[in-house]
Regions:
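Nudix hydrolase/Nudix homology domain
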Residues: 11, 34, 70-71, 114-186
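Conserved hydrophobic "DFG−1" position in protein kinase catalytic cores
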Residues: 19, 50, 59, 124-125, ...
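Short, Lys/Arg-enriched N-terminal segments with co-localized hydrophobic residues
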Residues: 3-13
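The catalytic Nudix box helix
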Residues: 58-59, 75-108
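Acidic, metal-coordinating catalytic segment for phosphate/diphosphate chemistry
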Residues: 12-47, 53
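Short loop segments at secondary-structure junctions
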Residues: 23, 52-55, 63, 126-130, ...
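A glycine-rich, hydrophobic loop/mini-helix early in the fold
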Residues: 45-77
Length: 186
């Protein structure tokens, strides 16, 4: 995720998103981050779940100064930039936020969820990554850790992990277990 990313010379740059319809078709328009979406307009968001050989999931703690969900554990992800496809956005977010480089063939699309103002593509990367090998993006990420699914859901219950909604987690776990990809709409 990116909040007011620094540009050249330390100035803030405007992040632009492509506008999509509810089926993911481009509307031929862009929106500057922070501007309000109208009904029927969506932007593309990617969530990348890194899963190790023990079935644990890599989560990250958002930096304390962020406006949206500060000091909250969440999945790695963010909005696709204008002109960027979902796969490119997923690889970029992994690299920026955690320092994990992934080839396109390493990432598997689990499916897409329609949310209030976004179409959220869930991706999986299967990789054993030592925490010591991560390069956290200090502007956005304060910490990272591996958790089991049970630990993750306990964190959701105790409000220490962002609650994306029960349908989200149901879909995520079904997809990680290899059930057929379903594209539920919320």
């Amino acid at each position: 995720m990116r909040e007011n990313p620094p540009g050249k010379g330390g100035r803030l740059t405007m992040e632009k998103w492509d506008l999509l319809d509810g089926d993911g078709r481009p509307l031929g328009q862009t929106l500057v981050r922070g501007d309000k979406l109208r009904p029927g307009q969506y932007h593309l968001v990617v969530h990348i779940w890194v899963e190790d050989s023990k079935g644990r999931l890599l989560i990250q703690k958002r930096a304390p100064h962020l406006k949206l969900m500060p000091d909250t554990w969440a999945v790695t992800g963010g909005s696709a930039l204008a002109g960027e496809d979902s796969l490119t956005a997923a690889a970029r977010e992994l690299s920026e936020e955690l320092g994990i480089e992934a080839a396109p063939s390493d990432l598997k699309l689990l499916g897409r969820l329609r949310r209030r103002n976004s179409l959220c593509d869930l991706w999986r990367l299967r990789r054993d990554v030592p925490l010591s090998a991560l390069r956290l993006q200090k502007e956005e990420v304060a910490d990272a850790r591996w958790v089991s699914r049970g630990q993750l859901m306990e964190m959701v219950k105790c409000r220490r992990f962002h609650h994306y909604g029960s349908p989200y987690f149901d879909f995520l776990f079904r997809s990680l277990d290899g059930e057929p990809d379903i594209l539920p709409v919320k």
